[in-house]
């Protein structure tokens, strides 16, 4: 520090020291119930909250950027989700009931609020409660003339019918979201390019009418008549984003901050296979205060949230459409990841952080591009972020209890603060659009080509929901023009039911690979779609991500000899064989159409015992009192073994991280002995932690008293190079 201050010169040093002395000093007190998972000599003290103005003085952004307050308490408290209507007004989900106040009949104290800046000074000056009586709403998005809200166990559709900004209609669109853990439920609602509603869910899962899934990405039609699980992640999912090309990404809250979603799980046999892959180069983050508290993955994205892209011109050119923003609330920061093509898929480089604070309450949980083209940040502003595992004497430093939401009960959780900021680049242009609320058809048509993805999707939504079929001719003309508007014109025609075969064929033959890719994704899954795909040549597209989309389409077409022969022929292509995404999609297509086996694509079984010399570690997911032992004479024939015993209910394990080859078939095998295993849990078993939902990779489970019993499970490592 002294060297830096010397190097910057006397004037800047004086400026720095003046700024530091002007800040309100952080103040602390000693309190109980501060988890100490890091096993510091003593738990951290409780920092008192700061005003928004003082908090900003402890928060860093890059040179050339400004963090500007839009709203704060009492205007908004505990903001968990952000969305904007066609008028450019911010809507926020506010939840003081999170995480444990699950109310009877789900009538709670939470709200959907509209926050407006009516005088153009950049600050909220009008707050309207659109809907109240909610209980832990986690996300919202617009469609069908109203707003969709995740309100587990339901997804609601709310609509104002008389123009007073109050919800007059409240309908249930979906039922079945799990409520066993409130931070693992549904979130991240988005209006998709395909005119359906997309979202994510964690391990609380969805289950209704035989449709069960969890920890990943799904979509549903606006009326809720169809719900599809599309991309399997490996744990609690709380991030979703679309780049300008329509490719899908996400993040999970367990050290996996950037996933690419390459293949829909609907085409994979038994929904098992490579549908999504963690592509981040590193999950490490870099707080600017040592006083961070985490439950696991110390120093990394253990609570990653969001994956919005810099999809506007309000960012440096090298960022646009490529850089994603991922929140890390346990590190008091907002991180960045640079995505780039990697074969048919993507890779994602950890690009450090964009915002970081030494205020220990600063807790960004959502970051989205707003109608002004800038990055808006939802600051939960809370000293306690951790949900679970529940602290116990050995892990966390004291014995806590879980509440109804499966979060540890903690009197230090705050229900009085919340902030929403805008991050503004000094060189950002002013938005060309302020509102599409009263826009004409011509204005909506022009907005399909706006530089801000928000306005493009909003215009598309309004045209489709408004059934504006009278502009189909203009939309077809736009598909034939260069620029990003062609993609949205294509999907608008599709949503209106006006995408004719000639327009579709021309899009498939376009010189723009992104338009070709989206045209493939819009193909009808019938004989007409088969004709279009074979007329276009996209199954051999030089753009490998577009080729991947074509292979996915092949796997969804009805079986026919032309399709079967094409899949067999494509399997002999060396490029297709070597690319993990292309080979996985072809493998799914081959199984669907019973095409000839691709010898070069068959998985090679490993004969080596990868568990012979590993570092076994203890994990306690819930419950207290378990002992983890390494007896030397209680194993088979008096040998060594690993042992867990507990007098109380617990979810715990011995685990080891193992390096594996991607797309390789393995067998997990061992022997288990049990005594007195009872209760409502699964029992004693082996499993692969990253492959546990919707159908867990797990062995037979033993309960009661059983002598040494061999159990095993065969599985595929998919795109993973390390498993637990």
Question: How does the language model describe each region?
Answer:
Residues 1-444, 455-458, 462-464:
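Beta-propeller domains with acidic blade repeats across secreted/periplasmic ectodomains
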Residues 596-724:
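Extracellular and organelle-lumenal recognition/adhesion modules and their flexible linkers in secreted
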Residues 312, 329, 338-342, 359, ...:
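Hydrophobic alpha-helix feature that most strongly marks membrane-spanning transmembrane helices
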Residues 441, 472, 500-501, 531, ...:
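Core helices of alpha-solenoid repeat scaffolds
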Residues 431-434, 454-467, 484-498, 503-509, ...:
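Structural detector for internal amphipathic alpha-helices that build alpha-solenoid repeat scaffolds
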Residues 442-449, 476-480, 504-509, 534-540, ...:
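HEAT/HEAT-like alpha-solenoid repeats
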């Amino acid at each position: 520090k002294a060297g830096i201050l010397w190097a910057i010169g006397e004037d800047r040093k004086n400026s720095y020291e003046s700024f530091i002395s002007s800040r309100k000093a952080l103040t602390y007190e000693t309190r109980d119930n501060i988890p100490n998972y890091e096993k510091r000599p003593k738990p951290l003290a409780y920092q008192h909250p700061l005003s928004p103005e003082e908090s900003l003085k402890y928060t860093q952004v890059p040179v050339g950027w400004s963090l500007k307050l839009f709203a704060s308490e009492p205007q908004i408290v505990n903001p968990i989700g952000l969305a904007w209507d066609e008028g450019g007004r911010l809507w926020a989900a506010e939840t003081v009931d999170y995480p444990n106040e699950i109310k009877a009949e789900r009538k709670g104290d939470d709200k959907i609020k509209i926050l407006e800046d009516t005088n153009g000074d950049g600050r909220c000056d009008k707050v309207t409660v659109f809907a109240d009586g909610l209980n832990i709403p986690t996300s919202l998005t617009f469609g069908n003339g109203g707003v969709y809200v995740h309100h587990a166990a339901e997804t609601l559709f709310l609509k104002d019918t008389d123009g007073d900004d109050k919800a007059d209609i409240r309908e249930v669109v979906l039922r079945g979201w799990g409520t066993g853990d409130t931070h693992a439920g549904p979130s991240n609602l988005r209006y998709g390019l395909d005119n359906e509603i997309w979202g994510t869910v964690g391990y609380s899962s969805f289950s209704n009418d035989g449709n069960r899934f969890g920890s990943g990405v799904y979509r549903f039609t606006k009326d809720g008549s169809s719900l599809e699980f599309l991309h399997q992640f490996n744990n609690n999912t709380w991030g979703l984003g679309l780049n300008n090309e329509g490719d899908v990404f996400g993040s999970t809250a367990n050290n996996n901050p950037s996933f690419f979603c390459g293949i829909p799980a609907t085409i994979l046999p038994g929904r098992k296979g490579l549908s999504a892959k963690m592509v981040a180069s590193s999950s490490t983050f870099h707080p600017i205060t040592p006083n961070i508290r985490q439950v696991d993955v110390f120093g990394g994205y253990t609570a990653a949230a969001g994956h919005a892209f810099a999809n506007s011109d309000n960012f440096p050119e090298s960022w646009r459409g490529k850089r994603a923003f991922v929140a890390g609330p346990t590190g008091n920061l907002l991180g960045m990841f640079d995505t780039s093509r990697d074969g048919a898929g993507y890779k994602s480089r950890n690009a450090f952080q964009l915002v970081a604070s030494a205020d220990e309450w600063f807790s960004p949980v959502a970051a989205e591009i707003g109608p002004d083209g800038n990055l808006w940040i939802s600051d939960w502003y809370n000293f306690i972020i951790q949900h679970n595992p529940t602290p116990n004497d050995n892990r966390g430093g004291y014995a806590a209890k879980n509440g109804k939401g499966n979060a540890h009960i903690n009197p230090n959780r705050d229900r009085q603060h919340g902030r929403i900021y805008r991050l503004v680049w000094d060189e950002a242009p002013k938005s060309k659009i302020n509102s599409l609320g009263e826009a004409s058809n011509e204005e909506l048509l022009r907005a399909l080509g706006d530089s801000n993805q928000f306005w493009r999707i909003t215009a598309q939504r309004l045209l489709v929901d408004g059934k504006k079929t009278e502009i189909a001719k203009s939309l077809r003309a736009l598909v034939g023009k260069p620029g990003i508007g062609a993609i949205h014109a294509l999907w608008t025609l599709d949503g209106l039911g006006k995408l004719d075969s000639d327009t579709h064929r021309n899009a498939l033959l376009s010189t723009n690979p992104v338009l070709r890719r989206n045209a493939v994704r819009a193909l009808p899954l019938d004989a007409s779609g088969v004709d279009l795909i074979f007329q276009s040549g996209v199954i051999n597209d030089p753009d490998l991500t577009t080729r991947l989309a074509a292979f996915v389409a092949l796997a969804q077409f009805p079986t026919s000899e032309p399709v079967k022969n094409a899949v067999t022929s494509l399997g002999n292509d060396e490029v297709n064989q070597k690319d993990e995404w292309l080979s996985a999609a072809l493998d799914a297509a081959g199984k669907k159409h019973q095409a000839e086996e691709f010898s070069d694509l068959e998985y090679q079984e490993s004969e080596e015992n990868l568990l012979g010399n590993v570092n076994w570690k203890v994990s306690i997911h819930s419950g207290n009192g378990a002992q983890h032992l390494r007896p030397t004479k209680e194993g088979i024939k008096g040998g060594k073994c690993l042992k867990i015993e507990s007098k109380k209910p617990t979810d715990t394990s011995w685990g080891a991280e193992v390096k594996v080859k991607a797309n390789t078939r393995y067998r997990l095998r061992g022997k288990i002995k049990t005594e007195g295993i009872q209760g409502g849990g699964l029992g004693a078993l082996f499993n692969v932690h990253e492959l546990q939902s919707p159908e867990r990779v797990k062995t037979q489970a033993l309960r009661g008293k059983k002598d040494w019993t061999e159990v095993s499970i065969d599985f595929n490592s998919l795109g993973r190079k390390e498993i637990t």
